[in-house]
Every structure is written in structure tokens, then in C-alpha cells.
């Protein structure tokens, strides 16, 4: 574009360096966008798209936003996945001849937001990088708003994906094109993936990372952060290394299925474990709580250390209540310190910092009065009295937001500033006296002396008072004409204006310099402030644990050395909270080395899934160091939790419900150990009945013979309930239900033994399906059950249990041939049954329903809860009635 103006040439040159960003190009009081940037921004921001050089042959698309309100527009663009490069004027246009120098001072990306309004205060804003070296991965991530920086090494892709999901970054930086399947998995977390082809000469050092892979991953991350932010980030902490195996492992599906931090239906915090447990009082505590939920501990000593502090707060109710009041006055120290270091802190932020650190002595004194494990654990709390005094002496209590307009500092903080302010004040007093004098001299009572930034000070007279008024007679010089007034200046006013404005300008300039000096002084406290923030966040989490334990009647869990899981009257903490507490039915669970598999049967909607979830959630809460919703809890320490709950296609990867089910089952069967917990909810329902039944049985046998992981397995395949005869480690339990006058009543109580009825039609009635459908289903079911009974008399059960001598690996060709012959015989019988069933069902459908008193009695029998003796007695009674 040879005919473009010098300004547009400057724009195009800068834009060529930031092609993946929307360029905010500063022109006066606006940030302007051009070409495709303007089209995109106008659409997303819903602002007017105009044209530059509209009368020329090829006008340039253009839009803009005011610079003073740009943050809200930038926030909207970032939330829509864009990056924004901010290009500022580096010179004062009024004092520059020719083209004003411009350059990009910062690139805002989803992972580098620093503005308070652009972030959820209760969520970290992570940016993450990883590299692949041979078959291993190294990963590093940070939150530049808080200074947190961590790195780890990972052995395989599955663990990498799990770790990325746990961290939940808003942006990912990689050094090469990544595998398409891996990219799809990453898109579960974030769509902002940046590829960096090379690392620039670093102006920083990655300290204390001896592992070369982690060093390179962290260097890649920091190179990108410094490249986009273009400033000192001294608040970034020294990189902390960790190992994923130091925490309980849960993959994306487990966290989703258990609804730990996000609900499945609403995609929100409400209705999750995080929602239940969050009684924190500070943003730092809320963020720490989410981290603890995502990473339960596996170190028994650390778990019990947290539990002992929670117990201390439980025993000191009054002190805990007082502590909550103190914490409520603490602002987000982590992010306040981050803004100090970053350079975008304002005076109101520093007042918040002052109030926050003023509470530390109160908190420390309170903990010391408890004189127990809590006071010892948090003894490193530091009052920071010297910093508090500096803030107390310097800033006024309610300063303006802008740091460039003055009015920030207390009188007495700076002698020079006081002199400027006094000169300005005296000048304003003089102006008030001049206004009174001019009113007297001219006889115009409404005359006033005013000021604006364009014209300075002036005398204003309304048009109604101008009739017969001669300005020259009073030494007035016309300055501006308005529709309803005239504005004048006098030589005396002009002379005083220079003095007043000179003092004001000097005062404003000096206040800005003083504020920058104060900010730099506070930066020297960065490390100490970050340490206090970390302590307060952990303290806040632990008092929150005590608060919910007291409020909802939780107990302190104990950890067994013999790997026993024993829960008495356990409850699902979230379901219990949304229900009336007295309506929730608690249940027991007992798994140990000998009986480590529960096979759970019962009707739909009876509470099987809730029961399994509550066992998993109680285990997570316990390993976080929290009390749990039970009367008594003895638990092992689980290394991993695997879940297969619910039916949902994976639309991202294009996988069916059944494929997702099998993939989740594969992970559990492959990676589970004796120290793992497996939750399988109705495995096999995504395929044909016989395939599903066979797979479900094979999985149960595999767990029983290999990993010995503690397993809760719910099913509607009632044929599986005979497995307890061959697998000593398996125990049948069921969730009880009752029938009363043809209506199904859920008891929600888990009892020993199996049931052979899923009450599907009764559940359908509860869902208000049409009566015609319900009646038709009952007829078909009766016919099918009659045919099935005939079949059962002709052949044995299809359930075949592998003996210990015939392990999964030892399944022979002869076994396969026998199974094939059995399948053929079963298929012949099955075809005959289906023909008989089909004929019977249509005959029954056309007949009228006959009812009688005896039929009603039979219909209302709860066979599942009757003993054999009770059944025989009832049968005899009915037989007598028929005679």
C-alpha cells in the first residue's frame, strides 16, 4: 500500500509483529483498530464499524474505544479467546514534530490478565507450558497475578492430560505442533494454545531447577510471559517442583462425575463439593480450597496435621468465630502484591493492603491464646508493623482511583507537597474573594468564576445580564461565547491563573512521583507479604473445614493401617445439604482385604449412584484433612479414584457413550492398585444385554483376581448376583424399595443381599408416562417373565465364573469351544423364547385386564423383602381363599 499515510505505515509495521493479536493503536484519547481487526472487534464488542478515508477508492475499516474505558472492552475480547496488543504513544503529540513514536507496551492474553475486573477473585488464572522429551513430558505453570510458579515431570500422556485438567489453565504455550488427539483432550480445558517456535535470549534466570526438562519447560513459559508483558515481574516466586504421585490421582471424568468443582448440569460451582465446603472468608482461601479439592493428600502425616488443626478450631468455637471476623477484613494480599510488582496498583489497592496487614497482629494474638497445635502451626505469621506504619503515614483513607490526578497523600507526609497545596489553596481563596468583588463591581449577582481544562479560569455572565453591559468598561476580554452566556478573562485573573495552575500541576506531578516511590518501597516486602498470604489462605481453609463440620455434624476420620474402609451412617454431603437434613437416609459401608467388592442392585432412582458417590467424596474430604459426614469413619488412604458414572457421549473426541464407558473402565482396570477406589455404575448398559452382562462379569472377576481395588459396582444384571458363590471378595448389597397399593416407595437404605427386580415400570409411572404405555409395558413384562421361567426350567444359568485355576490369562481353546457350543444352545433356546414371548405379548395386549381381590393382593406383595417361610405362608393363605 504505497499510497498509505505515514501513520498507517507505522500501524502496518507494528501489526506485522503481532499478527495473532488485535492491535489497540493509540490515537489521542482513543484506541483505534483497522482492517480485519476492526471487523472482528466491532462484531464482538458490538460497536460501530466505520471507515477511514471513506471517500477514497479503498476505504479502511475502522473502529475505536475510549482509552479511559478500554479495560472493559479488553476483558470482553479476552473472554472470547482473543489476544490484545496495546500500542501506546511514547511521546507527547503536542511536543513532537512529525510522527509520534508508538510501540506495544503489553500483550494481554487469557493467561496473563492482571486487571481485577478481568478475573474471578476465587479462581486462579493459570498459564501453562509443557515440552516433550523422548517419551516423557515436563510441565510448568504460573499465575502472574499471584506470583505462583510450579514445575513437574510426567511419564506419560494420560498423566499429562490429567495434570492439565487439574490445573485448568486459561492458556497453554507449547514449542511445537502437538498431536491432534492430545490437542482435542487439551481443548476440554482451554482453546487458547500458543506455539512458540523459539526462545529469545532470556533476561531472567530459572533458579533452583536442576532437572533439565523442567528447566526448559519453565524457560519456555517465562520467555512467553516476559515477551508479552514487557516489564519486570519480580513477584514471580522461585519455581517449586512437585510430583503428581504425591497426591491422590483423579482424571477428568472422575472429577466431573463426582462434581467436585463444577456441576454437570449447570456447569457452575453451585451443587458441588467446592460449593459445600467453601466457608472461607478471603479470596486467597477460596483459591487454596479449590487446589486442595483438586489434589487430596496421600501422606498420612500431613493429612493428620490438618485434621488436628481442624479439631482445635472445633474445640475453640468462640475463637473461631472471632477469627472469621478478622479474616473477613483481609483483602486479596496475593493479587495486591502482584499489582504492586506489575506496576498497575492504585492508591485504593494500597489502602486495602494496609487494612489486610493490620489484621495480622489480631490473628496472631488470637492463635497464641489457643495455645495448641494451631498456634504452633501458624507461628510464622509476621505483623509487618514497619510497612503498616508507612502506609498509615502516607495515604489518605479514601484516595481517588487515578494516581495521576493528585489528592492521594496526607498532609505532613511531604513538606514540598504541602507547600504546593498551600499555594493552590491560597489561590482558590483569592478566586473566591475576586468573585465577590466582581459581583459587587458589576452589580451582577449571578456572575461566577469557573474553570475547565481547555480554557482555564474565566468569568461567566449569563446572556440575560449582558443587556447594557459594557465589558471593556470593567477590563473584561471576551474568551468564549455560549448560547446562554459569555465568558471573559481579565489581566489580573490571567496572572493569578498561572500561579494557581503552576502550583496544582507541580503538586500533581510530585504526588505521582511520591506514589511511584511508595510502590517501589512496598515491592521490597514482596516475599514477606507472599508468605503471609500463603499462611492466611491455609488458615482460612482449615477454619472453613471446622465451620462446615460444626454446622453439618461431621466427624473426624481415622485412617486404618489394615486398609479397611468402614463408614457408619455416611451421607452424601451435597445431596444432604440441598435436601431437608432430617429426610436424608444415612448408610453404612464396610470394605476390607477380604470383602473389597460391593455388587449393588436396586431400582432406578433408589440412590445407588448417590451411595457410591458419597463413599468417594468422603474419601476425598478425609484426605484433604477435613471432617466427613458420618457417625464414624475409618478409611484407608487411596492413591487413585476411578469412576464410570452416567451416560454421556464425548462429542469432542467423537466417541460414543459405550466407547467412553469402555475407555474409563480400561483406565481403572489397567492402573488401579490395591490402594485404589473404583466406582462402576451400571457398566455394560451401552451395548446389547448379553455383551454388557459378559463384560460386567469379566471386569468384576478381573478386579477380584488382579488389583484387589476396593470397588463399588452397581448393576441391573441380576444374573451377576450369583458371583458371590464363587468370589469370596464380593458381597451383594441392595438399595431397598417397597410397594404399597401398587406404588413404589424408595427407602434409600442399603441392605445386605441382592434383589431381582429393578422396578422399571414403577419408576416409569413415577415419571408420569402415559397410562397406555405403562399398561402395555406391564403386559409385555408379564409375558416375558412367563417365557423366561419356562426357559429357566430347560437350562442352567448362563453365568460362568472363572475358577482361580482358570485365570483371565489362562482361558484355553477348549474353554472357548465349550463356550461356543453353549452359546449356540442358548441362542436356539433364546429364539424359541422370543417367538413364544412375541405371540403371548400381542395376545395379551388385545385382551381386557381382569382384576380381582386376590390379584390385587399378589400385586401388592413385596417379594424382595419376604423370607421363603413368609412367602410359603402367604401362598397357602391365597390358596385357601381360592378354595
UniProtKB/Swiss-Prot annotation:
One of its GO terms (molecular function) is mismatched DNA binding. Keywords: ATP-binding, DNA damage, DNA repair, DNA-binding, Nucleotide-binding. It holds the Pfam family MutS_II. InterPro entries: DNA_mismatch_repair_MutS, DNA_mismatch_repair_MutS-lik_N, DNA_mismatch_repair_MutS/MSH, DNA_mismatch_repair_MutS_C, DNA_mismatch_repair_MutS_clamp, DNA_mismatch_repair_MutS_core, DNA_mismatch_repair_MutS_N, DNA_mismatch_repair_MutS_sf. PROSITE patterns: DNA_MISMATCH_REPAIR_2. One of its GO terms (cellular component) is cytosol. GO terms for biological process: mismatch repair. ATP binds at residues 602-609. Disulfide bonds: none annotated. Belongs to the DNA mismatch repair MutS family. This protein is involved in the repair of mismatches in DNA. It is possible that it carries out the mismatch recognition step. This protein has a weak ATPase activity. This is DNA mismatch repair protein MutS.
Amino acid at each position: 500500500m504505497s499510497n498509505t499515510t505515514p501513520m498507517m505505515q507505522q500501524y502496518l509495521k507494528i501489526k506485522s509483529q503481532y499478527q495473532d493479536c488485535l492491535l489497540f493503536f493509540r490515537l489521542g484519547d482513543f484506541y483505534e483498530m483497522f482492517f480485519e481487526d476492526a471487523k472482528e472487534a466491532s462484531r464482538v464488542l458490538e460497536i460501530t464499524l466505520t471507515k477511514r478515508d471513506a471517500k477514497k477508492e479503498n476505504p479502511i475499516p475502522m473502529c475505536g474505544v475510549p482509552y479511559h474505558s478500554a479495560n472493559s472492552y479488553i476483558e470482553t475480547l479476552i473472554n472470547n479467546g482473543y489476544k490484545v496488543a496495546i500500542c501506546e504513544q511514547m511521546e507527547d503529540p503536542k511536543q513532537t514534530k512529525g510522527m509520534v513514536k508508538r510501540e506495544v507496551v503489553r500483550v494481554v492474553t487469557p493467561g496473563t490478565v492482571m486487571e481485577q475486573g478481568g478475573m474471578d477473585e476465587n479462581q486462579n488464572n493459570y498459564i501453562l507450558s509443557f515440552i516433550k522429551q523422548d517419551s516423557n513430558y515436563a510441565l510448568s505453570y504460573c499465575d502472574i497475578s499471584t506470583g505462583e510458579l510450579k514445575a513437574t515431570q510426567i511419564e506419560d500422556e494420560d498423566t499429562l492430560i490429567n495434570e492439565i485438567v487439574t490445573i485448568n489453565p486459561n492458556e497453554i504455550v507449547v514449542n511445537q505442533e502437538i498431536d491432534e488427539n492430545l490437542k482435542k483432550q487439551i481443548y476440554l480445558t482451554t482453546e487458547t494454545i500458543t506455539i512458540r517456535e523459539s526462545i529469545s535470549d532470556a533476561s531472567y534466570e530459572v533458579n533452583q531447577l536442576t532437572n533439565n526438562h523442567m528447566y526448559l519447560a519453565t524457560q519456555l513459559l517465562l520467555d512467553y510471559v516476559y515477551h508479552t508483558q514487557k516489564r519486570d515481574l519480580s513477584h514471580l516466586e522461585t519455581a517449586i517442583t512437585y510430583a503428581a504421585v504425591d497426591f491422590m490421582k483423579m482424571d477428568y471424568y472422575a472429577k466431573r462425575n463426582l462434581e467436585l468443582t463444577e456441576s454437570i448440569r449447570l456447569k457452575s460451582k453451585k451443587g458441588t463439593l467446592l460449593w459445600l465446603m467453601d466457608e472461607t472468608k478471603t479470596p486467597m482461601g477460596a483459591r487454596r480450597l479449590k487446589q486442595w479439592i483438586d489434589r487430596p493428600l496421600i501422606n498420612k502425616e500431613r493429612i493428620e496435621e490438618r485434621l488436628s488443626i481442624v479439631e482445635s478450631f472445633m474445640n475453640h468455637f468462640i475463637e473461631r468465630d472471632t477469627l472469621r471476623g478478622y479474616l473477613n477484613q483481609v483483602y486479596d494480599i496475593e493479587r495486591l502484591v502482584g499489582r504492586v510488582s506489575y506496576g498497575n496498583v492504585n492508591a485504593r489497592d494500597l489502602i486495602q493492603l494496609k487494612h489486610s496487614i493490620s489484621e495480622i497482629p489480631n490473628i496472631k494474638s488470637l492463635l497464641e491464646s489457643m495455645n495448641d497445635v494451631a498456634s504452633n502451626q501458624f507461628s510464622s505469621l509476621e505483623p509487618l508493623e514497619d510497612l503498616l506504619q508507612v502506609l498509615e503515614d502516607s495515604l489518605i483513607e479514601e484516595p481517588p482511583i487515578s494516581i495521576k490526578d493528585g489528592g492521594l497523600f496526607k498532609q505532613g507526609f511531604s513538606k514540598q507537597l504541602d507547600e504546593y497545596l498551600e499555594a493552590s489553596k491560597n489561590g482558590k481563596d483569592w478566586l473566591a474573594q475576586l468573585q465577590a468583588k466582581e459581583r459587587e463591581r458589576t452589580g451582577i449577582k449571578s456572575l461566577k468564576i469557573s474553570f475547565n481544562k481547555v480554557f482555564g479560569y474565566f468569568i461567566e455572565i449569563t446572556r440575560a445580564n449582558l443587556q447594557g453591559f459594557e465589558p471593556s468598561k470593567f477590563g473584561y476580554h471576551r474568551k468564549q461565547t455560549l448560547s446562554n452566556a459569555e465568558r471573559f478573562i481579565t489581566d489580573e485573573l490571567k496572572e493569578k491563573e498561572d500561579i494557581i495552575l503552576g502550583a496544582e500541576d507541580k503538586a500533581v506531578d510530585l504526588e505521582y512521583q511520591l506514589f511511584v516511590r511508595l510502590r517501589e518501597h512496598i515491592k521490597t516486602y514482596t516475599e514477606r507479604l507472599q508468605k503471609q498470604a500463603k499462611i492466611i489462605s491455609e488458615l482460612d481453609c482449615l477454619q472453613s473445614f471446622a465451620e462446615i463440620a460444626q454446622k453439618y455434624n461431621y466427624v473426624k476420620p481415622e485412617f486404618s493401617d489394615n486398609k479397611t474402609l468402614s463408614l457408619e451412617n455416611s451421607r452424601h454431603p451435597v445431596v444432604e445439604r440441598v435436601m431437608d437434613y432430617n429426610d436424608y437416609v444415612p448408610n453404612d459401608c464396610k470394605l476390607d482385604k477380604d470383602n473389597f467388592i460391593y455388587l449393588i442392585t436396586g431400582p432406578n432412582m433408589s440412590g445407588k449412584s448417590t451411595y457410591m458417590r458419597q463413599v468417594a467424596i468422603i474419601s476425598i474430604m478425609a484426605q484433604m484433612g477435613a471432617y466427613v459426614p458420618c457417625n464414624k469413619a475409618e478409611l484407608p488412604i487411596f492413591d487413585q479414584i476411578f469412576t464410570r458414572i452416567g451416560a454421556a457421549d464425548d462429542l469432542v473426541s467423537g466417541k460414543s457413550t459405550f466407547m467412553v464407558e469402555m475407555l474409563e473402565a480400561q483406565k481403572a482396570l489397567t492402573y488401579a492398585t490395591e490402594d485404589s477406589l473404583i466406582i462402576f455404575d451400571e457398566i455394560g448398559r451401552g451395548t446389547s444385554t448379553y455383551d454388557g452382562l459378559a463384560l460386567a462379569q469379566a471386569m468384576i472377576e478381573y478386579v477380584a483376581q488382579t488389583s484387589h481395588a476396593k470397588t463399588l459396582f452397581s448393576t441391573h444384571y441380576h444374573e451377576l448376583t450369583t458371583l458371590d458363590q464363587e468370589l469370596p471378595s464380593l458381597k451383594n448389597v441392595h438399595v431397598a424399595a417397597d410397594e404399597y397399593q401398587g406404588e413404589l416407595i424408595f427407602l434409600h437404605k442399603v441392605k445386605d443381599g441382592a434383589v431381582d427386580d429393578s422396578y422399571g415400570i414403577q419408576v416409569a409411572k413415577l415419571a408420569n408416562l402415559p397410562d397406555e404405555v405403562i399398561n402395555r409395558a406391564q403386559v409385555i413384562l408379564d409375558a416375558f417373565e412367563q417365557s423366561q421361567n419356562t426357559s429357566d426350567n430347560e437350562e442352567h444359568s448362563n453365568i460362568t465364573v472363572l475358577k482361580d485355576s482358570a485365570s483371565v490369562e489362562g482361558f484355553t481353546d477348549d474353554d472357548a469351544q465349550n463356550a461356543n457350543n453353549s452359546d449356540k444352545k442358548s441362542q436356539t433356546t433364546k429364539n424359541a423364547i422370543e417367538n413364544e414371548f412375541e405371540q403371548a405379548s400381542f395376545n395379551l395386549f388385545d385382551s381386557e385386564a381382569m382384576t380381582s381381590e386376590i390379584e390385587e393382593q399378589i400385586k401388592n406383595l413385596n417379594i424382595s423383602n419376604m423370607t421363603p417361610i413368609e412367602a410359603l405362608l402367604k401362598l397357602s393363605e391365597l390358596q385357601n381363599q381360592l378354595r
